[in-house]
Regions:
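Positively charged n-region of N-terminal signal peptides that target proteins for export
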Residues: 1-4
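Noncatalytic scaffold domains of N-terminal-nucleophile
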Residues: 22-42, 46, 54-55, 59-226, ...
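Bacterial N-terminal signal peptides
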Residues: 7-16
Length: 248
């Protein structure tokens, strides 16, 4: 088994904790997982207990973050991964940040109309071509020991069974409610309950996301890059005013 140390930048969303919680030192002999959400960290730790290495655990954690903090992490975005190979000390960096579609120009957001309508923040023009899935898949293939299906299992379980919404998450849904309603059919949004943000403590279930992860596990990243999932992304982006193609 190839030994690695890994640090994944997955879009941290944190809130203030009591001073006593921050002061406590925690030690572990064989491995430790830290992320923006305890359920995502638990997913990574589960993979370690099943014999996975650090990269396997990192990908499992990132997949679970897609479920528990969908506003900040996941398949529609991108990121970086820094890996240190324990055997050689070599440091490897994977860059899978999202990129601008081929139709974008350097002055796309420079016009007065773009500034007034906030093209860089809202709508299809603000959406980059996602690199996250390709990054996760590449990390697993090159440095992991487990399959996508294996590391995605905790995230799929979370998406299907649901988890209790945090009060901050309810606030984020409320803050983004106007944009969510503008670009989506409210009836399809799992974040709403009769048109209102899910209240803190309510279960958030995302069966469509679980189905997506299962499809990727079965068919590979090609379902997004050139496949039916990619077609759906392109259609949604362009419907919202963007200009993305499947070639992107």
């Amino acid at each position: 088994m190839r030994k690695v140390w890994v640090m994944v930048l997955v879009g941290v969303l944190a809130w203030a904790l009591p001073g006593s919680a921050l002061a406590e030192d925690i030690w572990a002999e064989h491995g430790m997982v830290s992320s923006a959400h305890r359920l995502a960290s638990r997913a990574g730790a589960e993979i370690l207990t099943l014999g996975g290495n650090a990269v396997d655990a990192a990908v499992a954690t990132a997949l679970a973050l897609n479920v528990v903090e969908p506003n900040a992490s996941g398949i529609g975005g991108g990121g970086f991964m820094t890996i240190r190979l324990a055997e050689t000390g070599e440091v490897v960096v994977l860059d899978y940040r999202e990129t601008a579609p081929g139709s974008a120009t350097k002055d796309l957001f420079a016009s007065e109309q773009a500034k007034t309508e906030k093209w860089s923040i809202s709508g299809g023009k603000s959406v980059g071509v996602p690199g996250w899935l390709k990054g996760m898949w590449t990390a697993l293939e090159k440095y992991g020991t487990m399959t996508f299906a294996q590391v995605a299992a905790p995230a799929i379980r979370l998406a299907e069974e649901g988890f209790a919404v945090h009060p901050m998450q309810t606030g984020i849904i409320q803050d983004e409610l106007e944009r969510l309603m503008a670009y989506n059919d409210p009836a399809t949004l799992p974040f709403l309950d009769e048109g209102l943000p899910l209240a803190a403590g309510k279960l958030l279930k995302q069966p469509a996301l679980a189905k997506t992860f299962r499809l990727i596990a079965k068919k590979g990243p090609g379902v997004l890059y050139g496949g039916p999932l990619g077609e759906a992304v392109v259609a949604a982006v362009n419907k919202a005013g963007g200009a993305m193609t499947l070639d992107d």
